[in-house]
């Protein structure tokens, strides 16, 4: 049985008041968390369920929690399982970002907020998704590749590295490491790790993170500060510190409905903040504030300098070094080939200078479209290419898999192809959606699904129909 730390109970009750705290405690100890997903609008047209009110275009509450692991369309990136409170970032982006921007998600793993942000950003924007912890950065890269949008760069760096890089951003999301009080309901381990000392360590670290990244935010730029915790030390007090020490201004969001039951400032200060409390609002714990840096923001596409004196043709770029194979990608974008450790990428040409600056100064894990690996006998197509929204799938032979065969494929088991399947690389699909590659060598086919991504469970729940593809 869950037991909440006494220091947490005493402090939080004093902060929230008896009534609000009792609703929180009851939710943590007695209630099931709601199940919600967010669809990928670049791959998916709709989903079952009730719209999440602060993210109505892509967020959905589900009435039950299905076995998501056994839905091939989850692995194909058509949707992401995300608790509803975290989708509030969608509202912030849509309200404050009306023109193309360059944005940084500084502490992005596992990628839920990054993919939510990418879906909400105006076309022509570039998103850097960064995770400082090496072990967590790989799952971030995986989820970004499944999402499949080309205007994203994934890095594994500390804030100080970005400071040295001289890259400048219009918007920065700092979903900072925290004491995790908002995770108590769904993660009992978070309860065991909580302590007042950890809270103290966190609020100090959070200030260091914001301070380190502040110079990377352009004058007039937007900082979205968020935690998944409740205490004011990591929340309101840090927002107040950002205003006092760094000169930021707290901004309000319009259209936040009273029926959403989002709790506002609990410290008596008058700046607007947004706190999601389980048992009060329909989601897990989240705190968010929108801050504006002093100065005038200079409007315009972040890629405008890269477009000067460029020809307006749509041809795939070619030249010395790696090349992008003809026909692999949609040709409504000008592509620049790039290579790193035998892996070839296609970078949208408008980001050439920015990508080169990132590659020079940061540890780039993924950028644009990951095409494949060059072993000297031509490119072996990568899983990320199969899941990219830029894939020209009609260029490749395709085999539609049954549900059972799709699950076998995602377990990296052998899947037989029809006898008339051409030799070479074959795009396998499920419900007409690409899920990966096989190499047909005649008497058998090699499953090219990434070993580290495979489904490990032998259990199967049966075919799911949660979302509808484009």
Predicted features and spans:
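S-adenosyl-L-methionine
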Residues: 130-167, 174
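Mobile active-site "lid"/loop adjacent to the S-adenosyl-L-methionine
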Residues: 135, 170-211, 228-236
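Helix-to-beta-strand junctions that scaffold the AdoMet/dcAdoMet cofactor pocket
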Residues: 122, 217-219
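Conserved SAM-binding loop of SAM-dependent methyltransferases across substrates and taxa
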Residues: 110-123
């Amino acid at each position: 049985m869950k037991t909440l730390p006494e220091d947490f109970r005493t402090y939080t009750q004093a902060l929230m008041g008896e009534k609000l705290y009792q609703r929180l405690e009851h939710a943590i100890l007695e209630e099931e968390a709601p199940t919600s997903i967010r669809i990928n609008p670049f791959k998916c047209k709709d989903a079952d369920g009730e719209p999440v009110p602060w993210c109505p275009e892509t967020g959905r509450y589900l009435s039950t929690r299905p076995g998501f692991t056994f839905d091939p369309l989850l692995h194909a990136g058509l949707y992401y399982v995300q608790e509803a409170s975290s989708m509030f970032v969608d509202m912030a982006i849509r309200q404050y970002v009306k023109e193309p921007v360059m944005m940084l998600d500084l502490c992005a793993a596992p990628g839920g907020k990054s993919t939510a942000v990418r879906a909400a950003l105006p076309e022509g924007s570039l998103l850097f998704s960064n995770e400082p912890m090496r072990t967590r950065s790989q799952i971030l890269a995986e989820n970004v590749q499944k999402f499949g949008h080309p205007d994203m760069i994934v890095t594994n760096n500390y804030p100080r590295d970005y400071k040295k890089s001289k890259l400048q951003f219009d918007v920065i999301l700092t979903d900072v490491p925290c004491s995790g009080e908002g995770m108590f309901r769904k993660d009992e381990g978070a309860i065991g790790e909580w302590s007042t000392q950890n809270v103290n360590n966190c609020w100090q670290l959070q200030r260091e993170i914001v301070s380190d990244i502040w110079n990377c935010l352009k004058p007039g730029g937007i900082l979205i500060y968020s935690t998944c915790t409740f205490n004011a030390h990591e929340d309101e007090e840090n927002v107040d510190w950002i205003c006092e020490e760094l000169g930021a201004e707290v901004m309000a969001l319009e259209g936040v409905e009273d029926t959403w039951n989002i709790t506002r400032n609990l410290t008596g200060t008058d700046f607007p903040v947004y706190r999601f409390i389980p048992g009060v609002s329909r989601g897990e714990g989240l705190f968010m504030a929108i801050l504006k840096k002093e100065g005038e923001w200079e409007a315009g596409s972040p890629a405008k300098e890269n477009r000067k004196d460029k020809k307006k043709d749509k041809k795939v770029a070619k030249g010395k070094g790696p090349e992008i194979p003809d026909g692999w990608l949609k040709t409504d974008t000008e592509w620049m080939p790039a290579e790193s450790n035998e892996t070839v990428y296609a970078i949208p040409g408008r980001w050439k200078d920015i990508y080169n600056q990132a590659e020079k100064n940061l540890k780039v894990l993924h950028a644009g479209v990951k095409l494949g690996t060059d072993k000297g006998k031509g490119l072996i197509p990568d899983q990320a290419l199969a899941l990219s929204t830029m894939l020209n799938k009609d260029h490749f032979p395709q085999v539609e898999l049954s549900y059972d065969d799709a699950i076998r494929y995602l377990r990296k088991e052998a899947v037989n192809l029809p006898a008339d399947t051409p030799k070479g690389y074959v795009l396998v699909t499920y419900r007409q959606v690409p899920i990966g590659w096989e190499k047909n060598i005649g008497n058998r086919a090699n499953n090219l699904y990434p070993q580290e991504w495979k489904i490990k469970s032998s259990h199967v729940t049966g075919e799911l129909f949660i979302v509808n593809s484009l």
